[in-house]
A protein has these predicted regions:
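Active-site rim helix/loop that mediates acceptor-substrate recognition in acyltransferases
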Residues: 30-84, 200-228
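GNAT/GCN5-related N-acetyltransferase fold signature
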Residues: 58, 77, 100, 231, ...
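Conserved acetyl-CoA-binding loop-helix of GNAT-fold acetyltransferases
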Residues: 95-122, 268-280
Length: 430
């Protein structure tokens, strides 16, 4: 189901799905919103992503001198699967391409597009929605909470002493360079094998692989042909890959090249150890930069001197989550401790509001149902979304006065039920 046409909140501005013929106008509005020049290759990229009913535009019918309404705000969504604790794929609505031209701000256009899309997502059966926020303070009012951060590292290779010797690796393994064709052919299957192991991960559509292979252009995406390496075990099974670039930089007669890790997938710890050891052994490299790792990543602990690893400047919140169907979402994930907790949830849209009892069992299953029992915790749906994937801390939210503890110790109990040993991580923008 798409999004039905509807008059926008500002008189003379109509919010509706765009037609295929309006792609160029929609992309022009998006470029203005992101403060980039509009160029034809961007429209080619939108062609790959076009899905009837899922690209919304706000059209100004009163544009001076225009022979047709002009697009002044953009919004796109698509369906994907979000890996939740335990490995299940939760059906979610992924939101992207959200802009409002600076000439049309404060007119309710974002609110109109967002509420239309979220309502349609609930009807389609999406249990949650996700997005990446350009600014921290925009999306909380729509029920989104920061659920998956990024935490990268910048490592001085000489000071680090490299990766420690003796780390476990697969006996007889090998690492080989791969062509772009091999990357595009074998990478998708490897990613699909890895994705169920990592809460917070999402699918990579065909367009994602084509973009990373340099087959299509996208303004704002700084594609540079890098190096792809595959890791195989002794029997030839592909268990990992890394994609990286190396900048040609010298300090006089001495190489001072930074190596930037753009993609890293390992199905097990042995594969990861071997790939990191390889990356830290590349000739002429002075710094290894890994900007898009997950929180608590072990990279510094793999080094002879962990102090050589400095937090990357892009470390920040990344994926935001908005719960739409609490029973479906909480039944899909797994839990690491049994227990019961009653939550009083507020939701401006009313979709998830009410008193809910979360019950988890020793076998890892759980459910959430309506109840009239007294609440242990009071919180809004955005804060619940930040806890859902197992990476947030209810105790920290309580200390920051971002939720209300009605029963002493309830925040710690919430962490016992909801937090997971494996932190959520999503390496992919969308």
């Amino acid at each position: 189901m798409g999004n039905d046409a509807q008059q926008g909140p500002d008189r003379g501005i109509e919010i509706r799905p765009i037609t295929h013929e309006e792609l160029a106008d929609w992309d022009r509005a998006l470029a203005l919103g992101f403060m980039r020049p509009h160029v034809p290759p961007a429209t080619e990229w939108r062609e790959l992503l076009f899905e009837p009913g899922r690209m919304l535009g706000a059209f100004d019918h009163g544009f001076p001198g225009a022979d047709r309404p002009r697009c002044v705000a953009t919004f796109r969504s698509f369906d994907t699967g979000l890996t939740v604790p335990g490995g299940e794929r939760l059906p979610v609505d992924a939101i992207t391409g959200v802009t409002v031209n600076s000439t049309h701000r404060r007119r309710g256009l974002l609110s109109g597009m967002m509420r239309r899309d979220l309502a349609a997502a609930r009807e389609r059966g999406s249990a949650a929605a996700i997005l990446i926020a350009a600014e921290h303070n925009i999306y909380g009012r729509f029920g989104f909470g920061s659920a998956v951060p990024l935490a990268g590292w910048r490592v001085d290779v000489l000071r680090s002493g490299g990766v420690r010797a003796g780390l476990p690796v697969h006996a007889g393994h090998r690492i080989d360079f791969a062509t772009l064709e091999e990357f595009g052919k074998l990478g998708p299957d490897l990613h699909e094998r890895w994705r169920p192991t990592q809460p917070g991960a999402i699918g990579r559509p065909d367009a994602w692989w084509r973009l990373r292979a340099g087959e299509v252009d996208l303004p704002g995406f700084d594609w540079k042909q890098g190096f792809n390496v595959f890791h195989r075990t002794a029997d030839g099974t592909l268990t990992g890959m890394a994609n990286y670039t190396v900048d040609d930089k010298w300090d006089g007669a001495y190489p001072d090249c930074p190596l930037t890790v753009r993609d890293f997938i390992a199905l097990d710890r042995e594969t990861a150890n071997a790939l990191w050891a390889f990356l830290f052994s590349v000739d002429w490299v002075r710094h290894v930069v890994a900007p898009h790792l997950g929180p608590g990543h072990v990279l510094p602990l793999l080094l002879n001197d962990p102090r050589a690893a400095k937090p990357h400047e892009e470390t920040a919140d990344f994926t935001w989550l908005r719960l739409l169907d609490l029973p479906a979402a909480f039944a899909a994930r797994r839990y690491e401790a049994p227990g019961r907790l009653v939550l009083d949830v507020t939701d401006r849209e009313g979709w998830t509001a009410g008193r809910w009892a979360l019950e988890t069992a020793a076998d890892g299953t759980g459910r959430i149902t309506h109840t009239d029992d007294p609440a242990d915790l009071g919180l809004d749906v955005a804060r619940l979304g930040s806890l859902y994937l197992g990476g947030g801390s209810a105790a920290a939210l309580a200390d920051a006065a971002l939720l209300t503890e009605h029963t002493p110790g309830a925040a710690v109990r919430a962490d016992t039920l909801l937090r997971t040993a494996r932190a959520p991580w999503n390496p992919d923008g969308f």
